[in-house]
Amino acid sequence: MIEMQDVYKKYPNGITAANGLNIHIKQGEFIYVVGPSGAGKSTFIKMMYREEKASSGTVLVNGVNLSKLKNREVPFFRRNIGVVFQDFKLLPTLTVFENVAFALEVIEQRPKDIKRRVMDVLALVGLKHKVRMLPSELSGGEQQRVSIARSIVNKPKLIIADEPTGNLDPDTSWEIMHLLEEINLKGTTIVMATHNKEVVNTIKHRVVAIESGRIVRDEQRGDYGYEG
């Protein structure tokens, strides 16, 4: 599913955010990526959907070598990946339905198929009754549910979640985690960067810890391992 072999990422300012990364992630796994702020977690996950390109080494996702992927090929590659952000990144002038449908309209799906699929995923995230609302009319938890619906509407094999509970209260964070669990149980691989100690220590999955651009710990059903 995902393979990194001797991956380095050095930025123009001289910072090395990935320092010899090697990892294999199987289809259907749920991975927490943890570590101190500035450790290289975001770079690690961004290289999986070519938001960042490795300076050297090999990054394979769904059988595609991202190191050799041309820029014009990136949008097509990303159709099999859903991304969930901490700050939701919804289009403020579009309704809930339109935000989720947008991903399918871009790839020119038939309107009838779009409507059916969008309503299916909104039912899954519990927002079928709010299809006509704008993001500004929703709570933070509801906005994150829309973001998750948008990320799965293409039926991706992989979801990358960057601090998906970071802006949410504890109760809402648990709701979002249970939703991600449900999606994972259907066979979707989830890679989630997080600082949420309680979530990692309670809902057990594989834990990959990154410090100074290196993987320092990789444990099945691991703990968060940091204070706070």
Segments and roles (model prediction):
Residues 153-157:
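A short, proline-enriched helix->beta-strand linker immediately N-terminal to the Walker B motif
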Residues 133-138, 142-144:
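Conserved ABC ATPase signature
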Residues 49:
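Helix-to-loop junction immediately C-terminal to a conserved catalytic motif
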Residues 57-65:
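Conserved ABC transporter NBD signature motif
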